[in-house]
Amino acid sequence: MTQRKGIILAGGSGTRLYPITKGVSKQLLPVYDKPMIYYPLSVLMLAGIRDILIINTPHEQALFQSLLGDGAQWGVNIQYAVQPSPDGLAQAYLIGRDFVGGKPSCLVLGDNIFHGHGLTDTLRRADAREQGATVFGYWVNDPERYGVAEFDQHGKVIDIAEKPEKPRSNYAVTGLYFYDGKASDYAAALKPSPRGELEITDLNRCYLDAGDLHLEPLGRGYAWLDTGTHQSLHEAANFIETIQMRQGLQVCCPEEIAFGQGWIDAEQLERLAAPLLKNDYGKYLTALAKRGAVH
C-alpha cells in the first residue's frame, strides 16, 4: 500500500453553478447516479491511497461527514478540514500541512472527473515517482483556455503557462497533482497572485524551477471532465450514463474499488448494498459481491 496521503479540495463558493449551489456544495450535487465527490474520491482509491483529507467550507462540513463518514465502510480513513475562504488551490497544502506531515501526497479537485481504461496504471506510475511532482496533461483543442504544459519525450516538463495567447502545447494541466514531501514548504513560501490567491501553477513552478516537474499524458481513450458550469455538469452526467448503460459497469464506484483493492470483502460489500436494494446501484453491488470484481 502506498504511504501517499490524499487531499480532495471541495471548498469554494460554486458561483458558476448558481442558483443550484446557493444552498448546497457543488461537490454534493449528483453526477448521474452518484454525488460528485465520489469521483475524485475514487481516483485516490484507484491510486491505492487510503488516508484522505477532505477540505470544505465551514457550513458544509457536516453534510460531507453525513455522506462519507470516516471512510471505514470502504477501508479508508477520511478526515476533514475547513477552508475558511477560497484563497487558492495551493492553500490546500497550508490547511493540510499537519495531515500530510511531510509525506508524499496527491491533490485532486473536487469537481474533476477522470475516466479511462489505463488510469490505474498511470496513477501507479506517478505514485512510484518518489521525488518531485507529477501533473497530468490532457489534450485539448483550445489550450489557450487552460494552464498548459510543454514537456519532452521523457515526460519532463519544460515550461508551464497559464492561458497562453500562443500555446506551445495542446496538453492542459488537469486538476490532479502528485507531490513529494516538499509541497507544504513550497506552498508556505508562495506569495498571493494579483487576484489574491495562492496559485497551484506557482506551486508547480517551484518544482519546475528545481527540475523536478513531470507530466503523465492522458491521451486517447481518457475522459477529463470539469463539472464547474451548468453545461459541463449536464454533459458529465450524460457521459457517465452512456458508459454505464452500455457496459453495465459502474464508473467511480467507491464500494467496487474498495472490493477490488481487497480493502473490504464480499460480506461487507453485501452489507453496504442492503440499504440500497430499491435502486440499480444497490443491485449492482449485490451482483458484484457474488461474481467478483471486473478488471
UniProtKB/Swiss-Prot annotation:
List, in alphabetical order, the Gene Ontology terms for molecular function in this entry: glucose-1-phosphate thymidylyltransferase activity; metal ion binding
- Enzyme nomenclature, EC number: 2.7.7.24
One Pfam family from the UniProt entry? NTP_transferase
Q: In which pathway does it act?
A: Carbohydrate biosynthesis; dTDP-L-rhamnose biosynthesis; Bacterial outer membrane biogenesis; LPS O-antigen biosynthesis
InterPro entries, alphabetized:
G1P_thy_trans_s, NTP_transferase_dom, Nucleotide-diphossugar_trans
Q: Which UniProt keywords apply?
A: Lipopolysaccharide biosynthesis, Magnesium, Metal-binding, Nucleotidyltransferase, Transferase
Q: Which reaction does it catalyse?
A: dTTP + alpha-D-glucose 1-phosphate + H(+) = dTDP-alpha-D-glucose + diphosphate
What Gene Ontology terms for biological process does this UniProt record contain? dTDP-rhamnose biosynthetic process; O antigen biosynthetic process
Where Mg(2+) is bound, by residue? Answer: 111, 226
Which Cys pairs are S-S linked?
none
What EC class is this? transferase
How and how many cofactors are bound, per the record note? Binds 1 Mg(2+) ion per subunit.
Q: Tell me which cofactor or cofactors this protein depends on.
A: Mg(2+)
Taxonomic superkingdom = Bacteria
**How does this protein assemble?**
Homotetramer.
Describe the task this protein carries out.
Catalyzes the formation of dTDP-glucose, from dTTP and glucose 1-phosphate, as well as its pyrophosphorolysis.
| NCBIfam families given in the database record | rmlA
User: Which protein family is named in the record?
Assistant: Belongs to the glucose-1-phosphate thymidylyltransferase family.
Q: What is this protein called?
A: Glucose-1-phosphate thymidylyltransferase
Species, as recorded? Xanthomonas campestris pv. campestris (strain ATCC 33913 / DSM 3586 / NCPPB 528 / LMG 568 / P 25)
**Lineage of source species:** Bacteria, Pseudomonadati, Pseudomonadota, Gammaproteobacteria, Lysobacterales
Gene name, Swiss-Prot/TrEMBL: rmlA
